[in-house]
Regions:
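Bacterial N-terminal signal peptides that target proteins for export
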Residues: 1-7
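Post-cleavage N-terminal segment of exported redox proteins
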Residues: 4, 17-20
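Alpha-helical structural motif
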Residues: 6, 318, 361-365
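Bacterial N-terminal signal peptides
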Residues: 7-16
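C-terminal functional module detector
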Residues: 21-35, 48, 128-231, 328-333, ...
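A metal-dependent hydrolase metal-coordination microenvironment
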Residues: 22-138, 143, 148, 221-283, ...
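Non-transmembrane alpha-helical segments in soluble domains
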Residues: 244-248, 323-326, 366, 370
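Glycoside hydrolase catalytic-domain groove-lining segments
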Residues: 312-335
Length: 521
C-alpha cells in the first residue's frame, strides 16, 4: 500500500487585536488539552443515504450532511444507520444558493433551513417527444412568499455524431417564464409553446408556476440531437440577507409542524461561506451581518485552495483571501471540506470534552463550530498499487495537542504549540509554521514550538492575528529523492498538498501529469 499524499496539514486561528487593551480572541482558551476528544466532522459534504457508512468508516463521528435540490437537512440521521452506529452524531445542515442579489453558496450548519426542489425525470432521452409532469409545486403568489413559486428548468443537448446543427422545440404548461431576481415576465408574457432552442440558446430558464403541476414537452430529432440534461430545480430566490435571517432566526414550520428555519441550538452552529469567489469587501459584508456568520472555506477538494485549473489553483485564491480578511481585523474561521468528493481530502476536527450522551455531544459539536474550537486537516490519501484510493482513505490522527496563549502580567506573550499522532514510520518529520499579517513569521522543525508575539516600539502587540500550520512529511519522496527540511520549508501549502509518489484518481489530481510527482524536489 502506498500513499498518494505525503503531508498532513492542520490550520487553526488565533486573532489578536493590537489596540491599547490588547484584546485577544483565542478560540482555544477553554480547551482542556489533557482530556479533549478529537471529533472528525465536515461543514459541507454532499452524500446519499448509501454513502453514510462509508463516511463513518473513514473516521467521521459528526455527520451534518448538506445536500441541495432540495436543500433539506438529513437529520435525524436514518434510523438503520444510527442503530448500526450508536455513537454517531448528526446535525441539520444544507447548502443554500441562488439568492437574488449575490452569487453566494453557503451552508447553515445546525440550521433547519429548508428550501428548494429538485427532480430529474427518468425518461428515454433517445426518443421524441419527451414528456413529463412535475407535481407538488408551489403556485406563485406575489403577496405571500413568492420565491416558493419560482423554478429553474435545465435543458441541455448537443449534436449527435456528424449530425450537424442540433435543436429542440420546447413547450411548458402550468408556468410562465420569469426573472428569478425580480419575478418579472418578459414582454411576450412568458408563454413557452413550441419554442425553438438551438445550441446558442440559454441552457436554463426560470419559470413562475401558475399551477401545482408543470407539464414539459421536448420535441427533437434523435438522429440530429442528443438530450444530455433535463431537470426542474429550485433555489432560495431571496436576497441573501433574508436567507441568512431565515437560516439563523427563522421560525417557519412545514405542514407536519417540523421546523424548516432557524438553528437547532441558539448557542451553536452558524453560516459558512462556500468556495468563496468574491472580494474582501463583499466577504466583510457577509461577516459583519451577524457574528453567527463564521467564516469561509479555505480548502475545497474540487479546487484545492481555490481554482479549477492548475494555473489558477497555484495562486491559492481561497487561502490568500482568508489572510486578506484576517488583515482587516475580522474574525474569520477557515473550513476544510470535500464538498461532493467522498474520496477526497479536507476535514474539520472538533475539539470537544469527553463523555456525554448523544444529545449533549450534538450540542457540543455545534458549539465547537460556533466558537472556533476546531482545526482544519488534510490527511494523506491512502491508495493501492493501482493508484486508486482505498481504506482508510484520508483519515489521519495527526493533531494539535496544545495551542496555548501564554501570558505574563496579564499580557499575551507567546503562542505555545505541540502536535502528535503522525505515522512516524511513513512521515517522521514535523514542521510548524506561524503566520501573521506579515506572512510566515516563524518556522520550527519539530513537534513543538513557541512563537513570541512581536511588539512595536510602544510595547503593543505588533500583529493582528496568528495562524498555525503543522506538517508531517517523509525523509524521501518521488522514488527516493531526499526531502530535507530546507527543501520542505521552501514549499507553500499548495505545493505541499500536491506532493505524491503515486497518481490517484479522485479530486484535483486531474491537474497532474500522467506519472509521478508534480514537483522536482
Amino acid at each position: 500500500m502506498t500513499k498518494q499524499g505525503i503531508a498532513t496539514l492542520g490550520v487553526l486561528l488565533l486573532v489578536g487585536a493590537s489596540h491599547a487593551a490588547e484584546r485577544v480572541l483565542n478560540p482555544y482558551r477553554d480547551v482542556d488539552w489533557g482530556t479533549v476528544t478529537y471529533v472528525h466532522s465536515f461543514s459541507h459534504q454532499h452524500a446519499t443515504h448509501g454513502r453514510l457508512q462509508t463516511l463513518r468508516d473513514m473516521g467521521y463521528e459528526h455527520l451534518p450532511i448538506s445536500n441541495y435540490y432540495p436543500s433539506k437537512p438529513l437529520y435525524p440521521l436514518p434510523e438503520d444507520f444510527r442503530k448500526a452506529n450508536p455513537d454517531v452524531l448528526g446535525a441539520p445542515n444544507a447548502e443554500q444558493h441562488s439568492t437574488t442579489d449575490s452569487p453566494i453558496h453557503f451552508n447553515a450548519i445546525g440550521s433547519y433551513y429548508t428550501t428548494g426542489y429538485g427532480e430529474t425525470p427518468r425518461v428515454r432521452r433517445d426518443r421524441s417527444p419527451i414528456e413529463h409532469v412535475f407535481r407538488g409545486l408551489h403556485v406563485f403568489d406575489p403577496a405571500r412568499e413568492p420565491w416558493r413559486g419560482i423554478y429553474r428548468l435545465d435543458l441541455r443537448f448537443d449534436a449527435a455524431a456528424n449530425s450537424g446543427e442540433a435543436s429542440v422545440r420546447l413547450t411548458v404548461e402550468g408556468a410562465r417564464q420569469a426573472s428569478y431576481k425580480d419575478f418579472s415576465e418578459p414582454a411576450d408574457g412568458g408563454i413557452v409553446r413550441d419554442r425553438v432552442l438551438t445550441l446558442a440558446s440559454a441552457r436554463s430558464m426560470t419559470f413562475k408556476a401558475t399551477a401545482p403541476e408543470i407539464r414539459v414537452q421536448i420535441v427533437f430529432d434523435p438522429a440530429v440531437t442528443r438530450i444530455t440534461q433535463f431537470r426542474l430545480m429550485q433555489g432560495t430566490y431571496r436576497p441573501w440577507r433574508d436567507t441568512f435571517r431565515a437560516a439563523l432566526d427563522g421560525s417557519a414550520r412545514d405542514a407536519e409542524g417540523r421546523p424548516i428555519e432557524g438553528l437547532m441550538f441558539p448557542e451553536g452552529g452558524g453560516i459558512t461561506i462556500n468556495h468563496p469567489g468574491e472580494s474582501v469587501t463583499r466577504l466583510a459584508e457577509y461577516l459583519d451581518f451577524d457574528p453567527r456568520v463564521l467564516g469561509i472555506e479555505v480548502w475545497n477538494q474540487h479546487e484545492m485552495f481555490g481554482g479549477q485549473t492548475l494555473e489558477k489553483a497555484a495562486t491559492m485564491p481561497f487561502y490568500t483571501l482568508w489572510d486578506e480578511v484576517l488583515r482587516t481585523g475580522r474574525r474569520c474561521f477557515g473550513f476544510f471540506v470535500k464538498d461532493h468528493c467522498i474520496f477526497g481530502r479536507g476535514r474539520n476536527v472538533l475539539l470537544m470534552p469527553p463523555g456525554g450522551d448523544t444529545a449533549t455531544r450534538e450540542r457540543q459539536a455545534l458549539q465547537a463550530y460556533r466558537n472556533g474550537r476546531f482545526f482544519g486537516l488534510l490527511g494523506a490519501m491512502t491508495v493501492g498499487a493501482d493508484g486508486k484510493p482505498t481504506m482508510p482513505y484520508d483519515q489521519s490522527n495527526f493533531r494539535f495537542t496544545r495551542l496555548a496563549l501564554r501570558r505574563e502580567a496579564d499580557k499575551p506573550v507567546s503562542l505555545d504549540v505541540s502536535v502528535d499522532g503522525a505515522d512516524t514510520q511513513r512521515r517522521p518529520n514535523t514542521q510548524i509554521r506561524f503566520i501573521t499579517d506579515q506572512g510566515v513569521a516563524c518556522v520550527v522543525d519539530g513537534n513543538s514550538g513557541s512563537f513570541i508575539l512581536p511588539r512595536s516600539a510602544d510595547g503593543r502587540v505588533a500583529c493582528r492575528y496568528v495562524r498555525v500550520e503543522a506538517f508531517a512529511y517523509p525523509n524521501t519522496h518521488s522514488g527516493g529523492q531526499t526531502l530535507t527540511p530546507a527543501a520542505f520549508t521552501a514549499l507553500n501549502v499548495f505545493q505541499i498538498a500536491r506532493l505524491h509518489d503515486v497518481r490517484g484518481d479522485s479530486g484535483v489530481v486531474y491537474m497532474d501529469g500522467k506519472d509521478g510527482t508534480p514537483l522536482g524536489i
